[in-house]
Every structure is written in structure tokens, then in C-alpha cells.
């Protein structure tokens, strides 16, 4: 029958337009995420979220200095909240500080207990950094964790990292090309 990952590869090859969630067993659902922020005082939480939003907007506008400043303020306000570390990691990566980004991602995973939205995003970012550095085994491990936490992007990355899927995709593309453009002898 094959593993759920094998089934996901075949699903992606033969039915590329269907969502990966259709593969039985691939959605290894985590227990209810719950409210990750419920443990923080409401006023501080709202201020921290506002600072993060300002940081995200600054990063989107290309002002990484301000973004890092806002994320740092959010971290100072609630140092045990994973989300700001995850956001700061993204800004650090954009600034070229890969080591700093990885430190923040590790911290976010630790604070989140490896569960919830912040952990899922951290595993995706860590997987992307590993992939960009050519560390495909590390990328695969991080994407597997993110996929278990519900990330469809991580699932797609896992399929792309599978060498058998790459070979099958190449063979299928060649075969489809031959079917669309038959040789002159026919």
C-alpha cells in the first residue's frame, strides 16, 4: 500500500490540482491548539500584538531596522511569547542574519512547546533556511514537523524534496510532452 508520504507523492503526480489534505493519513492532526496567548495579561498581549503588527508593516515596506526594533520591543514586553521571535527571525533572515534567525526560530519552538501556530511557522522558516543552505535532510525534518502541525506549504515542500517524486515528475512531463507532440511518423 505504501506510506502516507508515498501516497502524497503519487497524489501530487497524478492529481496535481487536488489538495494534499485528501491523502488519508497525511493530516496527522495535532491535539487542539488551544489559545496560545491565553496565559498572558490582556493589556500586555494587545500591546505586544500591536508592536508586532507595526514590525510586520515596517518589514513589508522594506524598513528592516524599524521592524527589528518593534519585534525587539514586543519581545521585551512579553519575553515568553513565541510569535515575536518568529517574526523577528523573518526580519533577521531578510537582513541576512541567518544565525540570528535560527536562534529566534529555536526560541520560538521552545517557548511554544513545539505546538501551535508559532511552532508551525517556525518549522517552516527553519526548513526553508535549511533548504537554501543545501541541508535537505534538516529541511525535510523541519517540514515534516510543520506538516504534522497542519502546514500545507510544508507538505508541498516535502513532496518536492522527495527524489522519487522529482524523478516521476520528470518522467511524467516527458511522457505528456510526447503525447501532446507526437512524432512525425504517425
Curated annotation (Swiss-Prot):
PROSITE patterns: TPR, TPR_REGION
SUPFAM superfamilies hit by this protein: TPR-like
Keywords attached to this entry: Repeat, TPR repeat
InterPro entries attached to this UniProt entry: TPR-like_helical_dom_sf, TPR_rpt, TTC36
Residue spans of the TPR repeats: 48-81, 83-115, 120-153
Any single GO BP term: tyrosine metabolic process
Family (UniProt): Belongs to the TTC36 family.
Protein's name in the database: Tetratricopeptide repeat protein 36
Native organism: Mus musculus
Lineage, highest ranks first: Eukaryota, Metazoa, Chordata, Craniata, Vertebrata
Amino acid at each position: 500500500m505504501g506510506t502516507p508520504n508515498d501516497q502524497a507523492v503519487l497524489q501530487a503526480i497524478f492529481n496535481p490540482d487536488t489538495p494534499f489534505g485528501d491523502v488519508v493519513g497525511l493530516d496527522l492532526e495535532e491535539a487542539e491548539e488551544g489559545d496560545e496567548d491565553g496565559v498572558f495579561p490582556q493589556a500586555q498581549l494587545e500591546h505586544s500584538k500591536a508592536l508586532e503588527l507595526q514590525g510586520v508593516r515596517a518589514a513589508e515596506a522594506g524598513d528592516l531596522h524599524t521592524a527589528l526594533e518593534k519585534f525587539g520591543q514586543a519581545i521585551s514586553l512579553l519575553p515568553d511569547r513565541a510569535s515575536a521571535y518568529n517574526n523577528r527571525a523573518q526580519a533577521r533572515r531578510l537582513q541576512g542574519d541567518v544565525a540570528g534567525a535560527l536562534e529566534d526560530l529555536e526560541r520560538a519552538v521552545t517557548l511554544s512547546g513545539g505546538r501551535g501556530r508559532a511552532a508551525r511557522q517556525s518549522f517552516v522558516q527553519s526548513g526553508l533556511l535549511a533548504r537554501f543552505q543545501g541541508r535537505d535532510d534538516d529541511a525535510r525534518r523541519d517540514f515534516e514537523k510543520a506538516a504534522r502541525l497542519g502546514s500545507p506549504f510544508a507538505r508541498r515542500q516535502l513532496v518536492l524534496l522527495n527524489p522519487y517524486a522529482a524523478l516521476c515528475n520528470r518522467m511524467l512531463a516527458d511522457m505528456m510532452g510526447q503525447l501532446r507532440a507526437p512524432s512525425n511518423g504517425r
